[in-house]
Design a protein with these regions (language model features):
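Signature of N-terminal electron-transfer/Fe-S-associated modules in redox systems
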Residues: 1-155
Length: 155
């Protein structure tokens, strides 16, 4: 099946097998490997991308359902919120193994786009769908709060 997607600001025409999730289109067809496979059932968050600015799990999102929508992967995250999150991640040395980080960062940027001043409970609630086997949850929470501070300082 031929589908046209807009990925990281550019239009791409891809030929995908019926039932192929967006995750595999991104990784295998477009060679955008920052988006990770974790569970395949939308439970871990490693595959999070933005579709029209909304964080979605690419392992259960199908290209034919989002044709014409803007897909943003970690490679293309250039929003104000995305830059603040990446700066905070580096400042607070959040990463351990790093496998979940692209999904964590995409979710955090989505939260801050919706709510620029989240409280700790809002951060936890929004990020709870992102699993980290290294248990960096406290550092993730601190980095999201720091990114909110960066955004506030820059406004």
């Amino acid at each position: 099946m031929r589908t046209t997607l807009k990925v990281n600001g550019r239009s791409v025409d891809v030929d995908v097998a019926d039932g192929m999730p967006l995750l595999w289109v991104l990784r295998d067809e477009l060679k955008l490997t920052g988006t990770k496979y974790g569970c395949g059932v939308a439970s871990c968050g490693a595959c999070t991308v933005h579709v029209d600015g909304v964080p979605l799990r690419s392992c259960v999102t199908y290209p034919e359902d989002i044709e014409g929508a803007e897909v943003t992967t970690i490679e293309g995250l250039a929003t104000r919120e995305g830059r603040a999150v990446q700066q905070a991640w580096a400042e607070l040395d959040v990463v351990q193994c790093g496998y979940c980080q692209s999904g964590q960062i995409m979710s955090a940027a989505g939260l801050l786009a919706e709510n620029g001043r989240p409280d700790p409970d809002e951060i936890d609630g929004y990020m709870e769908g992102n699993v980290c086997r290294c248990a960096t949850y406290q550092r993730v929470r601190a980095a999201v709060a720091r990114a909110a501070e960066i955004l506030e300082d820059d406004s």
